[in-house]
């Protein structure tokens, strides 16, 4: 709709719309979205490293908190390969006192096992359980689970990705 004496249409919006106020036009918000085009791979040797310290290091690398452009709503972390999971250290009496529980889905199907039993049967699950507890719960956390690869022994099939070795501090025996 044009005014009768001009060919200019009226500005849209209310009295405080950015089209009318030159002051509000200068306060435009710019959102920075970092690019996630690099896929870094990291190898961590778990032999002799305390489980909690190892899990916090891995969780922060998967989440991407080590990056200067960390954005909480984007997955920008590294892929982490953990080797020697069977030799992870548990301090104190945790080998016998720490209990892992799972439910089979049937009545009376609550299964429990100590950390010693879990490390002897499937050491990968002990590290995965500790790391997954430190990642976000929800859709983004489930997507981060695929970035963790845990192996009980020394070898891993991810050498084609050329992973960098991440230094860890083994437990000092006193």
Swiss-Prot record:
The lineage of its organism: Bacteria, Thermotogati, Deinococcota, Deinococci, Deinococcales. Part of the 50S ribosomal subunit. Contacts proteins L3 and L20. The keyword Lyase does not apply. Belongs to the universal ribosomal protein uL13 family. This protein is one of the early assembly proteins of the 50S ribosomal subunit. Binds to the 23S rRNA. One of its GO terms (cellular component) is ribosome. Keywords: Ribonucleoprotein, Ribosomal protein, RNA-binding, rRNA-binding. This is Large ribosomal subunit protein uL13. The keyword Ribonucleoprotein applies. InterPro entries: Ribosomal_uL13, Ribosomal_uL13_bac-type, Ribosomal_uL13_CS, Ribosomal_uL13_sf. One of its GO terms (biological process) is translation. It comes from the Bacteria. Residues 1-22, 153-174 are annotated as: Disordered. One of its GO terms (molecular function) is mRNA binding. Pfam families: Ribosomal_L13 (PF00572).
